[in-house]
């Protein structure tokens, strides 16, 4: 039985040098259809352009530009071969394709139960408070408030889901799949364990659905938040203004003041650091106000040299089966131990 487990966990899916470009080709074809043309995803083509226009500006003001002028230097700055051909990136690509199929089932589950129930809760809270109702169409001001309120509620719930993922040992074993990335590209966004993502999705959608139900009671004719390409305008703006640099090697800080409101790519780099001083920091998705309020914010004063990962042996997370099956094995071992604290790795 142990031999079979080793064979399964160490099964490698096309990460040898000769196969890398085959994997990339398959991924690219699927990716173009599934993500790049879909306006509701962070990996929509406009968001890529927004991020890498910013990256190009960063390059032009960097020392590298003045020492290595030319388009090849710019391309190597934005898309370094050692990162984009890294085993970790190849695993990101494979996981992204697999997860895209699993996500359809996951969202079917949460749309049937938690989201509908949360919407009803918000509706009945408003009714209990005896708030006034109007049959008039909501004004642009109401729609703007609704748009921001649903986003804030979703982000607040995301903050706590993310914090819990780093706090509870069993959940952390599943969240490790994302944090075990040794290098990061925008595709690392899709490197997650399906069970981890399902719980996150429930938290996020419950928050926004309760808020939506609350507004629906007061404005029965409200049709939804203000959107661009079916995406909340707040999210769309955040995505197009460089959010894809969060999972990258390119450092972008928002400065000491704006960073108290929004999570910058640099702050998310800190979150992915294996350095102990960076552990349990910057849990927010879009807004950093939650980290600020609850004492988990870390705003770097200047660029810091960061090693991405979780500080555990890389071979524990170097194959796709290990990233999917490993969390169940480790979680099961936690339940079997009488004293888990002595052996549970501290989440970064």
List the predicted regions and their residue ranges.
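Alpha-helical hydrophobic membrane-insertion segments
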Residues: 21, 25-29, 116-121, 125, ...
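Specific transmembrane helices
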Residues: 42-127, 146-154, 158
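A membrane-cytosol interface segment of integral membrane proteins
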Residues: 229, 301-348
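Short, membrane-interfacial amphipathic segments enriched in basic
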Residues: 21-22, 79-87, 257-260
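Short hydrophobic helices that act as membrane-entry/anchoring signals
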Residues: 2, 6-10, 19-30, 34, ...
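Membrane-embedded catalytic scaffold of the fatty acid hydroxylase/desaturase
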Residues: 98-110, 122-124, 132-306
């Amino acid at each position: 039985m142990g031999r079979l487990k080793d064979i399964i966990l160490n099964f490698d899916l096309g990460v040898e040098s000769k196969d890398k470009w085959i994997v990339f080709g398959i991924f690219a074809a699927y990716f173009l259809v599934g993500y790049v043309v879909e306006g509701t995803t962070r990996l929509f083509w406009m968001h890529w352009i927004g991020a890498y226009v910013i990256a190009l500006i960063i390059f032009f003001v960097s020392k590298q530009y003045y020492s290595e002028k030319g388009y090849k230097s710019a391309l190597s700055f934005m898309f370094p071969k050692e990162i984009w051909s890294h085993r970790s990136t190849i695993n990101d690509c494979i996981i992204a394709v697999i997860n895209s199929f699993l996500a359809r089932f996951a969202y079917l589950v949460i749309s049937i139960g938690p989201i509908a129930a949360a919407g009803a809760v918000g509706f009945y809270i408003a009714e209990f408070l005896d708030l006034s109702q109007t049959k008039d169409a909501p004004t642009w001001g109401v729609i703007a408030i609704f748009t921001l309120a649903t986003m804030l509620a979703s982000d607040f719930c995301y903050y706590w889901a993310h914090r819990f993922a780093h706090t509870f040992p069993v959940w952390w074993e599943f969240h490790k799949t994302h944090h075990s990335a040794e290098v990061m590209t925008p595709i690392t966004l899709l490197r997650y364990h399906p069970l981890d993502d399902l719980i996150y999705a429930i938290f996020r959608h419950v928050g926004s659905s309760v808020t939506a139900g609350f507004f629906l009671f007061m404005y029965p004719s409200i049709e939804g938040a203000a959107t661009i390409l079916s995406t909340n305008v707040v999210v769309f703006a955040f995505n197009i203004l460089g959010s894809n640099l969060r999972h990258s090697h390119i450092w972008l800080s928002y400065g000491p003041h704006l960073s108290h409101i929004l999570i910058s790519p640099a702050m998310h780099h800190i979150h992915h650091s294996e350095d102990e001083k960076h552990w349990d920091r910057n849990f927010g998705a879009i807004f950093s106000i939650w980290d600020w309020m609850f004492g988990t914010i870390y705003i770097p004063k200047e660029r810091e040299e960061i090693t991405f990962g979780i500080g555990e042996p890389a071979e524990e997370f170097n194959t796709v089966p290990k990233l999917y099956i490993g969390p169940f094995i480790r979680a099961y071992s936690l339940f079997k131990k009488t004293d888990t604290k002595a052996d549970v790795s501290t989440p970064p």
